[in-house]
């Protein structure tokens, strides 16, 4: 029996979500270009989801699409549609519409709190080389060796690096803002928690190459030394 020329499979990808708070294409273009200039290797031609929940229903989505594309981003889906008018506008603009699960109604009866799920931890005991990408889906990630520039660590949970960190670390990739990044020798190109990120030049000079912990406080990255 001949093999089918195509095969559809489910998969998981880490995508950034761009929340638009302005419907003027020129303003969006300038803001995105500034972001790309800050981290060209990370953001140029990056696939993104566009959230339009803050935009008016009559926003020109075609013009916004052109602005986002011109800035070097590639739209893989639109989210945040508040009503049918916005959904029709997305479809009319020939943009992919992502379906979002409906929130479950709260039961009148108080259910017993579920036991917290035990997270598995992915452990990497070898050096992570430039160009390598490691993703710990649904778990924490521990690296016990060095991470080279150009390497990328991604985890839905926390990230621990027990070695020299020169690459990129993205914790809380599924949106968990309580995730942390721990590093014994911090010289990262980029650190991100739940989509909020710092480039390497944002790391305080007194902590460069030192042991540090990064977390989110009021939706902003903060850093403190590890004693």
Swiss-Prot record:
One Pfam family linked to the record: MinC_N
InterPro entries reported for this sequence: CAP/MinC_C, MinC, MinC_C_sf, MinC_N, Septum_form_inhib_MinC_C
Cell cycle found in the keyword field: yes
Keywords: Cell cycle, Cell division, Septation
Protein family according to the UniProt entry: Belongs to the MinC family.
Reported function: Cell division inhibitor that blocks the formation of polar Z ring septums. Rapidly oscillates between the poles of the cell to destabilize FtsZ filaments that have formed before they mature into polar Z rings. Prevents FtsZ polymerization.
Protein name: Probable septum site-determining protein MinC
Organism: Photorhabdus laumondii subsp. laumondii (strain DSM 15139 / CIP 105565 / TT01)
């Amino acid at each position: 029996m001949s093999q089918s020329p195509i095969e559809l499979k489910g998969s998981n990808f880490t995508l950034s979500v761009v929340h638009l708070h302005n419907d003027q294409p020129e303003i969006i273009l300038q803001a995105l270009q500034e972001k790309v200039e800050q981290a060209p290797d990370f953001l140029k031609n990056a696939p993104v989801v566009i959230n339009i929940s803050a935009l008016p229903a009559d926003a020109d989505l075609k013009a916004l699409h052109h602005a986002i594309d011109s800035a070097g981003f590639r739209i893989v889906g639109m989210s945040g549609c508040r009503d049918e008018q916005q959904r029709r506008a997305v479809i009319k603009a020939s943009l992919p519409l992502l379906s979002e699960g409906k929130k479950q109604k709260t039961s009148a009866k108080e259910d017993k709190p579920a036991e917290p799920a035990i997270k598995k931890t992915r452990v990497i005991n070898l050096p992570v080389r430039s160009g390598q990408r490691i993703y710990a889906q649904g778990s924490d990630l521990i690296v016990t060796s060095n991470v080279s520039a150009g390497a990328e660590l991604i985890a839905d949970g926390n990230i621990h690096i027990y070695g020299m960190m020169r690459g990129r670390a993205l914790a809380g990739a599924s949106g968990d803002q309580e995730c942390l990044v721990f590093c014994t020798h911090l010289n990262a190109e980029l650190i991100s928690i739940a989509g909020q990120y710092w480039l390497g030049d944002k790391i305080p000079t007194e902590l460069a190459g030192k042991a540090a912990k990064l977390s989110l406080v009021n939706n902003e990255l903060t850093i403190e030394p590890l004693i």
